[in-house]
Amino acid sequence: MTTVPGPNAALRPTRRHDPNYKWIALSNTTLGVLMAAIDGSIVIIALPAIFNGIQLNPLEPGSTSYLLWIFMGYLLVTAVLVVAFGWLGDRYGRVRMYNGGFLIFTIGSVLLAATPFMGTAGALWIIAMRIVQGIGGAFLFANSAAILTDAFPTNQRGLALGINGVAAIAGQFIGLLAGGFLATIDWRLVFFVSVPIGIVGTIWAYLRLEELSTTTKRKMDWWGNITFGVGLASILVGITYGIQPYGSDPTGWTSPLVLSLIGGGLLLLAIFLWIEQRVAEPFFDLSLFRIRAFAAGNIASLLAATGRGGLSFIIVIWLQGIWLPVHGYSYADTPLWAGIYMLPLTAGFLIAGPLSGYLSDRFGARLFATGGMLLAAVAFIGLTGLPVQFAYPTLALFLLLAGLGSGLFNSPNAAAIMNSVPANQRGAASGMRAVFANAGFVVSIGLFFSLMIAGLAGSLSSTLYAGLVAHDVPVDVATQISHLPPVSSLFASLLGYNPMASLLPPDVLKALPPDQAAILTGKDFFPSLISGPFHDGLVIVFLVAAGMSIVAAIASALRGGKYVHDEAPAVAKDLATH
């Protein structure tokens, strides 16, 4: 491998010692990562408005796939492409790749806001443009941390990456609030909100960011790139379809398609590992995983992201589909209020993230990352004890603890990972770090939705049947509705949607006593009915998330002491890899 000067090599000495440049790099990359993170979650809570806007019934056969791909397509693309785009940053310039990502993301946002189609065509257009957004987001995620690591001295990287990491995680929570607010005005604003930010950020990035690193003249490892990308994509797509019904099963984990996708993906990743150990210039240097801080940090990141993603989705479902309607909120208003009621989670992260990043520069990452995951585990365990109809201050306390735990963990963990690798590997390392975080978010959807569906499947059918018959619905109609797949009930709750008005035939509703018909189609009946089965799944979900947080804490504790590759003597570097 040959090292060659980057396109702006002459500027490096001036920029590197310009005290203002590092803050320019931090502010722009933080804006880019914040924008990309917001768009990863903003559609979750705005899906009812989006489906209404394109005139598509979310409970119609086939709509589940559109619903999943509208918010999963973006996450899948960013998870799959970040390592490749980090490699491109090492090869052609991190700033160049980052700037291109800002531009692509902005174009995707414009095309989403201008969606010209309705119905199925509209859903397919949104999915395609979300994938375009995801490509831009992958460039941003893959190169932002490497740009900051180049710009900041080692004693300030924890603070810089902490602020950047706060933007990445807080953006997921801010997206929920923004989606709920904008959806009440116009569904297109959910996508348009990124356009002015993207335009300003793109122009700013092209004018002010400069390459500080040297580029590496490396041959493209095509087979490694293909096997990794296709293998990871296959697994994540398989997980996406695994939560949909298959035949008489409530989930699709026994489907030949799902098994083939996941099995084929695992095989391709095994081939990827075999290839990378044999090519002269690998797509990703697997020896980085011999660095204890890098390996332990990424394992902890995967587990933390999985638990955090599960928390976001399950709390949204809990609030939007059950708690808010029962407490008098109209279905039209539940997206906004669900975002508002989740603010303690965001507040905890915003408080702890920068502070832990700053302190980790002095004391190392292990104490803060380990303590943060233990605090998150306490929050998850506390959530298992909440009744379905909880007192909000209690929920707010546990959300605050979860946010504080995530904030304590994320910033020091990110800095420790990036500090542990050589300078010429920062792009690929940043990409791999993003893979673990983004893949964890996707895995959380498949894992926790499946656990919720399993919890619902045990008693949902009998509960629905008993509730309908008790309100004078004919036995044959009640029997038919009681076979509603658990995933449909879950998505109805996620969308803040009362399915009874569309599930009960018009002639049946007309024949019922007016008071009974009003109860069945009112905002209390469906949420109250499914709250018992929902709680069964809820306890399982939070216990699993608590277990993941504890394992992440163990991985964090085993990462070793403070270690910076650029400052470590040769002996220390060798010891750190064993």
Regions found by a protein language model. Give the residues of each.
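Transmembrane-helix exit segments and adjacent C-terminal regions of multi-pass membrane proteins
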Residues: 1-40, 274, 293, 361, ...
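Transmembrane-helix bundle of Major Facilitator Superfamily
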Residues: 2-206, 356, 383-384
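Transmembrane core module of solute transporters
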Residues: 26-75, 256-260, 268, 279-414, ...
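Hydrophobic residues within membrane-embedded alpha-helical segments of Major Facilitator Superfamily
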Residues: 28-31, 35, 104, 111, ...
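Interfacial helix-cap and linker-helix signal at transmembrane-aqueous boundaries
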Residues: 50-51, 88-89, 178-184, 239, ...
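C-terminal module of multi-pass small-molecule transporters
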Residues: 81, 93-104, 109-112, 116-125, ...
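Short helix-capping/hinge motifs at transmembrane helix termini and TM-loop junctions
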Residues: 115-120, 187, 208-211, 243-244, ...
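Hydrophobic transmembrane-helix bundles of small-molecule transporters
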Residues: 185-299, 307, 577-578
